[in-house]
Amino acid sequence: MNLIAIPALIDNYIWLLHNKKGECLIVDPGDATPVLHILSNYQLKLTSILLTHHHPDHVKGVKLLSQYFPVTIYGPQETFKQCANIIVKKGDFLVLLEKKFAVLSFPGHTLGHIGFYSYPWLFCGDTVFSAGCGRIFEGTTKQMYESFQEVNQLSSHTLICCAHEYTLTNLAFASSLLPKDRIISSYQRHVTILRNKKKPSLPTKLSLERLINPFFRCHDINLHQAINFSPLLGCEWLVFDYLRQKRDNFRGNSSQK
């Protein structure tokens, strides 16, 4: 099984997974054109589309793609009116490309946001970003925090396939909170080199995110001291809320979703 990150729009990635038979699925096609180019270049047959939520930059390419291919389109209830023809929810399982995918619930960015997990790949849309998290448009901070806890229960070897290239800005934010953190600083240099070469920083491994992503470190005393915020035991989501507010006002993030 092979994974391809297809750059689209301004900073989106459309994920494509294909097998040796030339069959493939894609996740969150906000634009059909780059997908059609890849399908042609690799001589692949599109069989399924997975949608994590209803925002246009994740679904706008579905209509055109479905005109070229008789695809099954899986998505949460919030995508039904737009394009999904099979509604899925937490606890459902799909067998696609001879692999089993679990449907997970990730409310926060939108209320009905879902993810698809087939080890080692997690397609999480706009929930987890490398070194960051999605903006909260419909849900609550606590819901997004709980979605992160769902992700954190997965294998440390999980490859997080998020939908946007925000890593450098997120690392700049993380570094502003923890300027002496050598792992964050080192990874920031590494990603800078990748991006200067026009290479993606994704997918990212969950084990790495536990180290560089402040939103996975709400329990971390070092982070509490750095931001001068000490939550009561069991109230780590308040740290998450504080971080999300700080991130919303951080310079250079005007394009982040």
UniProtKB/Swiss-Prot annotation:
GO biological process terms, semicolon-separated: methylglyoxal catabolic process to D-lactate via S-lactoyl-glutathione
Entry binding sites for Zn(2+) 2: D57, H58, D126, H164
Keyword annotations of the record: Hydrolase, Metal-binding, Zinc
Pathway(s): Secondary metabolite metabolism; methylglyoxal degradation; (R)-lactate from methylglyoxal: step 2/2
EC main group: hydrolase
Binding-site positions, Zn(2+) 1: H53, H55, H109, D126
Keyword tRNA-binding applies: no
Keyword Protein transport appears in the UniProt entry: no
Entry EC no(s): 3.1.2.6
Cofactor: Zn(2+)
Chain segments annotated as transmembrane: none
Assigned protein family: Belongs to the metallo-beta-lactamase superfamily. Glyoxalase II family.
PANTHER family: HYDROXYACYLGLUTATHIONE HYDROLASE, HYDROXYACYLGLUTATHIONE HYDROLASE GLOB
Task performed by this protein: Thiolesterase that catalyzes the hydrolysis of S-D-lactoyl-glutathione to form glutathione and D-lactic acid.
Name of the protein in its database record: Hydroxyacylglutathione hydrolase
Gene name of the record: gloB
